[in-house]
Regions:
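Terminal domain-initiation and capping elements
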Residues: 1-95
Length: 95
């Protein structure tokens, strides 16, 4: 690979790792199980109904649950969408 100055770039060194992050839902006293599970099902891709319910129960029992992990840009999108539906969200955790 050659940059615009004609310098040869080592492809092993020029690949930037995309930052990853975790999306975490927190327990609260006003969202119902049904609402939390429905939000997870409609917003998080490939979320099964069973997984949505399992995560919803985990949020209630332990106070929080990681509902998605992946690239930072997607994490920000899912975080914002879940927050806009009224879910209580932890700050995005970069990993």
């Amino acid at each position: 690979m050659v940059n615009s100055l004609g310098t040869v770039l080592d492809p092993k060194k020029s690949k930037a790792k995309y930052p990853e992050a975790r999306v975490i839902v927190l327990d609260d006293n006003f969202n119902t199980y049904q609402h939390v599970a429905n939000c997870l099902l409609t917003i998080i891709p490939s979320m099964s109904e069973q997984r949505a319910w399992d995560l919803t129960i985990k949020v209630d029992k332990t106070g929080s649950a990681e509902v998605w992990r992946g690239n930072l840009e997607q994490a920000e999108l899912y975080h914002e969408q879940l927050f806009s539906k009224g879910l209580t969200m932890a700050p995005i955790e970069k990993i």
